[in-house]
A protein has these predicted regions:
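Active-site cofactor/substrate anionic-group-binding motifs, chiefly glycine-
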Residues: 2-60
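Self-splicing inteins and homing endonuclease
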Residues: 9-28, 86-111
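Well-ordered secondary-structure scaffolds
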Residues: 17, 119, 138-278
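Short glycine/serine/threonine-rich phosphate/pyrophosphate-binding segments
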Residues: 32-42, 46-47, 54-55, 62-66, ...
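Structural motif
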Residues: 22-24, 43, 50-53, 84, ...
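A glycine-rich helix N-cap at a beta->alpha junction
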Residues: 69-93, 163-169, 173
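Phosphate/diphosphate-binding glycine-rich loops and adjacent basic-rich segments that engage nucleotide
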Residues: 90-139
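Alpha-helix C-terminal capping segments
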Residues: 39-53, 72, 131-136, 171-172, ...
Length: 278
């Protein structure tokens, strides 16, 4: 009840985004640098025809959050009105949540956490749920990496967090699928915004030298989220989420969608992985 009340109160401290129908989202508890799956998952989900307004942090406990990495190729600071316009036009976005002001009480707490490089488990749960509710999400995939150097170091803790996420999901009418995975190293090759962006585009371009571990994780998360969305989409209940995600990646549709998102966010849509150098 305390988690529910705190989440509800944090959502009420700022504006909310609203979109019709299925609104997908993804979050990773993080703790490992160089694993920038969001920038692969978002264009895959949007290419599948689902709305995915992704708001991300710049960084809390790693060198480069998703917002920093996306900022290499596009603007990430927008108002709620601008975000709504972008998402209505191209189906998705990858923007900095701190500028939007969704659940702003959380951003104040993040300023405390950053110098400590620490987040409590319950704070992670409340923070994630408040942001997702404020962004209008109703279908969510959660990535909970577990390992000796992760924010979550024991599987029993991840399982407890998963149960709490599911409980809050029911209270707020949000469908959630949780991916608990053992993580001992980064899935990509680069550390830092430019190199992590290069990893992302190597996967989207299907470059021969792309980081396969990053691709595999992004496809797994995309697949779980698509399956969750398909279950509530007439005529798509029997489709395989991960197989669909792979088809969208291999066909180039995910890359094309990413270029649409970059263009809509004022960036250079013709960016290539081999041009991304520090």
């Amino acid at each position: 009840e305390e988690l529910y009340s705190l989440t509800k109160a944090m959502v009420a401290t700022g504006p909310r985004l609203k979109f019709p129908g299925i609104v997908a989202d993804k979050h990773s508890a993080g703790g490992v640098a160089g694993t920038r799956t969001t920038m692969i998952v978002v264009p895959i989900i949007a290419a599948a025809g689902y709305t995915i307004p992704k708001t991300s942090t710049r960084a809390i406990t790693s060198p480069a959050g998703t917002a920093y990495t996306m900022e290499v190729v596009a603007t990430v600071t927008f108002t709620t009105t601008q975000i709504t316009r972008i998402v209505e036009k191209v189906g998705g976005c990858i923007v900095w949540g701190g500028h939007v002001g969704l659940a702003p009480a959380d951003d104040i707490l993040i300023q405390v956490e950053r110098p400590l490089a620490f987040e409590s488990y319950d704070k992670i749960i409340v923070s994630v749920m408040a942001k997702k509710i404020a962004s209008g999400a109703n279908h969510l995939v959660l990535d909970l990496p577990v390992g000796p150097t992760m924010k979550i170091q024991h599987f029993k803790d991840a399982e407890l967090m998963s149960r709490k996420f599911m409980m809050l999901g029911k209270r707020f009418k949000m469908k959630i699928v949780v991916d608990i995975n053992e993580t001992r190293q980064n899935a990509g090759r680069g550390i830092g915004p430019v190199l992590e962006a290069r990893d992302v585009f190597e996967v989207l371009e299907q470059a021969p030298e792309r980081p396969l571990a990053l691709e595999a994780k992004a496809l797994r998360l995309s697949g779980k989220l698509l399956s969750l969305c398909f279950a509530d989409t007439p005529g798509k209940k029997d489709l395989d989420g991960e197989e669909t995600a792979r088809e969208l990646l291999l066909s180039g549709k995910a890359l094309a969608k990413m270029r649409e998102i970059i263009r809509a966010q004022g960036g250079h849509p013709d960016v290539l992985s081999n041009k991304l150098t520090p």
